[in-house]
Amino acid sequence: MNNLLSAYVTMLLILLSISGGAIASENCNDTSGVHQKILVCIQNEIAKSETQIRNNISSKSIDYGFPDDFYSKQRLAIHEKCMLYINVGGQRGELLMNQCELSMLQGLDIYIQQYIEDVDNS
């Protein structure tokens, strides 16, 4: 049963990466399909993305018009959207929820970088 679950999670990760969804960095490739290792790796990637976004916003907030609560509101919206995956249940739902949050945070980071670039070039 454990091997079946491990194979399923590995296939899920492969499908997510093929489908163009954000997948945790290459560092997560050595997790060997172990759910807890995959989850921790994705959560570490989420933490890195959060730190990068907060640093970009805080260093640019005055010049670029970011409201004080911009990040917290965006992060809450991401979390609420991704919580839908919990309804899937079990380890699969937990993994999908975390992967969703990582993907959406990476999208938010790209959006913020583009916003800053647009303001700089206007």
UniProtKB/Swiss-Prot annotation:
Keyword Signal in record: yes
Cystines in this chain: C28-C41, C82-C100
Membrane-spanning parts: none
Keywords (A to Z) from UniProt: Disulfide bond, Signal
InterPro entries the record matches: TsiV3, TsiV3_sf
Signal peptide boundaries: 1-24
GO molecular function: identical protein binding
Family annotation (Pfam families): TsiV3
Disruption of the gene: reported phenotype: Deletion mutant is susceptible to killing by V52 strain in a VgrG3-dependent manner.
Effect annotated for changing Q91A: Greatly reduces VgrG3 binding affinity
Function: Immunity protein that plays a role in preventing early activation of toxin VgrG3.
Record's subunit section: Homodimer; dimerization is critical for inhibitory activity. Forms a heterotetramer with VgrG3 composed of one TsiV3 homodimer and two VgrG3 molecules.
Protein known as: Antitoxin protein TsiV3
Taxonomy of the source species: Bacteria, Pseudomonadati, Pseudomonadota, Gammaproteobacteria, Vibrionales
Recorded name of the encoding gene: tsiV3
